[in-house]
Amino acid sequence: MSKLIVLCPNPFRDTGLELTLRAKKLLEDNGYETRICPVFGANDKKAIPHGVTITPWSEVSSEAYLFIVIGGDGTILHTARYLNHASAPMLGINLGTKGFMAPLEPENIDLIVNAANGDFVPSERMMLDVELIRNGKVIYSDCGLNDVVIHGMGDCIKLTAWADGDKIVSFSGDGIIVATPTGSTGYSMSAGGPIVEPEAKNFILTPICAHVMGAKTFVLAPNRKITVKAERIHDRKAFVSVDGTNGVELVNDDIVVVRQSQKTANLVHMGLSSFYDSTFDKLLYKNR
């Protein structure tokens, strides 16, 4: 039986699924079985060309040998959320802006055959589990690859954070980010946090526009239980969101708990450039 390769496009970036269908033909010409499972818009008749067969995630996630994600970093993050129970690796083809998590550009599409043959470099990534506790009860839980963000909507909010019960920081400001090493090159970096190697196992705790001089980023061990309490929201609006998804609104004294997940994201790259090359090119000097 041939190996199953699942193509996970964002049809709003891969217009008409042009690149996806090229990848499908390329793989099938080399003896691989393929399925198309869009991350967004699977039922959008305008986004999915007539005659293209779409397969539900539930029918492929446990059988796939490799997932090829076609889109931007957001597409990869959404795919990782779908696949946090699957062990097959995930390779990205960049159709976004920075494309920091996607090692291939469309002009490198022929390399997906190499990846299907097992010629790739694995990159296991830490994920995080999130719980929102209100009045002693868990009312929301999620799992993310990048970060959990607690943020106000235009007004300062009061937050206090602990690690295993020890207070780390307490401040008023726009919010706080708890990022994984993968997420360290995203919102956390923009808020002044450090860049951390993606295969590392750490939490990066970064205040957002803290109205106090001493609120700095902390890098914590992965076995820490991070607790953040929303202490003063009142009539302001504040939310918690995981990997940029729609946020859940917070109320006074809500508690957000973040732990290292037992699940991991199994990304791969093709050895075309190192993490440091990508950082230099895509984040530091590309647009200068």
Locations of regions flagged by a protein language model:
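Catalytic core of DAGKc-family lipid kinases
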Residues: 97-174
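Glycine-rich phosphate/dinucleotide-binding loop and adjoining beta-alpha-beta core of small-molecule
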Residues: 69-95, 103-105
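Short glycine-rich anion-binding loops that position phosphate/pyrophosphate groups of nucleotides
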Residues: 12, 73-75, 98, 182-184
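ATP/nucleoside-binding phosphotransfer catalytic cores, i.e., glycine-rich phosphate-binding loops
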Residues: 150, 163-167, 216-288
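Redox-cofactor binding/interface segments in oxidoreductases and associated redox assembly factors
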Residues: 7, 69, 178
